[in-house]
Swiss-Prot record:
Domain Era-type G: 2-169
Quaternary structure and interacting proteins, as annotated: Monomer.
Region (G3): 57-60
Protein name: GTPase Era
Keywords: Cell inner membrane, Cell membrane, Cytoplasm, GTP-binding, Membrane, Nucleotide-binding, Ribosome biogenesis, RNA-binding, rRNA-binding
Organism: Borrelia turicatae (strain 91E135)
Membrane topology annotation: Peripheral membrane protein
Chief location category: cytoplasm
Annotated ranges, domain KH type-2: 200-276
Family membership: Belongs to the TRAFAC class TrmE-Era-EngA-EngB-Septin-like GTPase superfamily. Era GTPase family.
Stretch list, region G2: 36-40
Amino acid sequence: MKSGFVSIIGRPSTGKSTLLNSICEHQISIISSIPQTTRNKIKGIFTDKRGQIIFIDTPGFHLSKKQFNIALMHNVHSAIKETELILYVIDIQDKPGIEENEILTIISKSKINFLVVINKIDIQKTKEREIMIFLEEKGIKKDNIIKISAEQKINIEEIKDKIYENLQEGPLYYPEEYYTDQEMNLRTSEIIRGVTIKKLKEELPYSLYIEIEILEDRKNKLFIKANIIVAVESQKGIIVGKGGKGIKTIGEEARKIISEIFEKKCDLFLQVKLRKNWNKNPKLIKNLIN
């Protein structure tokens, strides 16, 4: 039996979280077209008769010098150090740039085995030729490259096969039925944050986080009270919406997902609260992403 830890890295919006969810066959990580949706190192677990793979989904790699983004990049680097294999995900629509050079340099210095995963092959207009030339120039062997569509689940089984080829014999780190090690509080807050980001599109994704005040199982029914925290007063109105319609829609969708995932009915109560300039508070940022 084989087992091991695998980090998933790549630029923002390359489909890392979609890949994780597709392999593990559960919604573990937030999926959004908005860059930098993933903040924490999210673990997904896949177990079959061959063994167990523990995936670590990481924030999108970029070179921004903003305080919040530097903290996110710390998560990327620490995830790489924890793993036996790296999945480097490239969006087939993106022409290789500075980030690709930087990521391959980091991978090379780590001395860790890696696979290059070219994602979104179901899309018509691509930069496949440029990507393949770039990888060839970097000395990446074709055996280390796999082309997939995480969203359409094309070549997902092939990825699993390739991963197991690169892992050593080892124990099961988690019980077979586990597909994530996230605590209920974190999973719940990530669901609410994901729904909020989806509804707001590009307006506020970096300026909000979710604070769970109460999460209780009351007679096989979840009771949840949560706050959507924003950094600026004007952002409250954007989330609440006209006549409270915005926050009501967020609550309804989040409640449905929470009920489906935890297989229990759910009472969810949401409020929007201001915590001025929270995204410039180093201590709070550290707590949120670790």
